[in-house]
From Swiss-Prot:
The protein's assembly and partners: Homodimer.
InterPro entries in the record: Adenylosuccin_syn_GTP-bd (IPR018220), Adenylosuccin_syn_Lys_AS (IPR033128), Adenylosuccinate_synth_dom1 (IPR042109), Adenylosuccinate_synth_dom2 (IPR042110), Adenylosuccinate_synth_dom3 (IPR042111), Adenylosuccinate_synthetase (IPR001114), P-loop_NTPase (IPR027417)
EC numbers: 6.3.4.4
Protein name: Adenylosuccinate synthetase
């Protein structure tokens, strides 16, 4: 009997932007398939290879590695135009996309009226601003859950596509005009554009659930690439300031069609501090010069939107919560170098809520308003870590910081990232041995 291939789910342990793209890239040489399972082209992953900058929004990072296939699973919402533009950008950079990239026939499609509805809704008077990327992600998921969405398989059926667009435009145009006084969308123009796009998308489309299960059952290794972060998860995040899909490890099963028993390990990616884009609770947020300094040194601006990220200290109650929800076995700590010059590093270890110490994560967004973080101050290492390549060569105080994070969070540190390049990655021996890594992302 052939043993099943190893699998790993890589998730964001915070509010997204943790550096998952780089980590998936450096690990992907050890995997034959990398699969996206949630989100859309609102998830910006930046990867630097040989001086070239690759910004991936929808396509899995694995396609940047020769011999590694990329899969866009059924849990993703696909904007066909954005997808084709990203494919062309990769071709222009010399990436072999054709024959190495596959799109689920069951993935739902983002259409122009989804963006129109989102923009109108986000800017409506009296509406709570979520801080979306205005790319139609949420409304597409709404149509999916309302059983009125268009799937990729339907996109390829010209008769069904035309009928769907005609009916949907009648509904959406009526809604946005009545509620937001927005201009209507021309269904004929939309059909012509998307019928042409469908012809170019068609060669990538397949039943990716079959592809992934066959790969695992034949002994191939598969990595599942999460989007956003746990605290943006539709169920477990800081609702309503969340994304519209499952950003946790459980989403990998639902969003690709593989069974839960096929998941070997979960890798959680966290920055050495915290960031957040858009609105919503952020207990350890910094509103002073230190927050500005971290933003500047960490280049904390969105890969997709360019928006400045809010910054704050590492929040261990949130990290413990993320590890619990995801079953995280290994941690990847990124942006460690951003803290290199600090004399001391505060870390939130618990909260004070209504005068009482607590580690509970409030279910209500307003509950976070009552939180006062309790900090433990750790000594800084005052050493440049960007050129260190071995764990044993790290400063003693850096190791103390990492050991503290391990003890407090309940997960083991597997990788440290000290810069944007592939070779600015430090692996622990325990992680390398546990995953059987042969290539260390150079």
């Amino acid at each position: 009997m052939v043993s099943k291939g190893k699998t790993a789910v890589v998730i964001g342990a915070q509010w997204g932007d943790e550096g998952k793209g780089k980590i998936v890239d450096v690990l992907s040489e050890n995997f034959r398939v990398v699969a996206r399972y949630a989100g859309g082209h609102n998830a910006g992953h930046t990867v630097l290879i040989g001086g070239k900058k690759f910004v991936l929004q929808l396509i899995p990072c694995g396609v940047l590695r020769p011999g590694c296939r990329g899969v866009i699973g059924n849990g993703v919402v696909l904007d066909p135009i954005a997808f084709l533009n990203e494919v062309q950008r990769l071709r222009d950079l010399g990436v072999a996309v054709d024959g190495n990239l596959f799109v689920s026939s069951r993935a739902h499609v983002i259409l122009p009226y989804h963006r129109m509805v989102e923009l109108a809704s986000e800017n409506a008077p009296g509406r709570v601003k979520i801080g979306t990327t205005s790319r139609g992600i949420g409304p597409s998921y709404e149509d999916k859950m309302g059983r009125r969405g268009l799937r990729v398989a339907d996109l390829l059926d010209s008769t069904l596509l035309k009928k769907h667009i005609e009916n949907a435009c009648k509904e959406k145009n009526t809604i946005v005009h009545a509620l937001f006084n927005a201009e209507p969308i021309d269904p004929d123009k939309m059909y012509n554009e998307y019928a042409k796009a469908a012809e170019k998308v068609a060669p990538f489309v397949t039943d990716t659930a079959v592809l992934l299960n066959n790969a695992i059952n034949s002994g191939e290794s598969v990595m599942f690439e999460g989007a956003q972060g746990t605290m943006l998860d539709i169920d477990h995040g800081t609702y309503p300031f969340v994304t519209s899909s499952s950003a946790t490890s459980g989403g990998a099963v639902i969003g690709t069609g593989v069974p839960p028993t096929s998941i070997s390990t979960v890798i959680g990616v966290t920055k050495a501090y915290c960031t957040r884009v858009g609105e919503g609770p952020f207990p350890s947020e910094l509103h002073d010069a230190m927050g500005d300094a971290i933003r500047k040194k960490g280049n904390e601006f969105g890969a997709v939107t360019g928006r400045p990220r809010r910054t704050g200290w590492l929040d261990l109650p949130l990290l413990r919560y993320s590890n619990m929800i995801n079953g995280t076995e290994w941690l990847v700590v990124t942006k460690l170098d951003v803290l290199d010059e600090l004399d001391e590093i505060p870390v939130a270890t618990s909260y004070k809520i209504d005068g009482k110490e607590s580690e509970e994560i409030p279910a209500q967004g307003c509950g976070f308003d009552k939180i006062e973080p309790i900090y433990t101050k750790l000594p800084g290492w005052k050493t440049d870590t960007t050129k260190i390549s071995k764990y044993e060569d790290l400063p003693a105080k850096t190791k103390e910081y990492l050991k503290f994070v391990e003890q407090q969070s309940g997960a083991k540190v597997g990788i440290l990232s000290t810069g944007p390049d592939r070779d600015q990655s430090i692996y622990t021996d325990a992680f390398v041995n546990a995953l059987g890594l042969k290539h260390l992302g150079k």
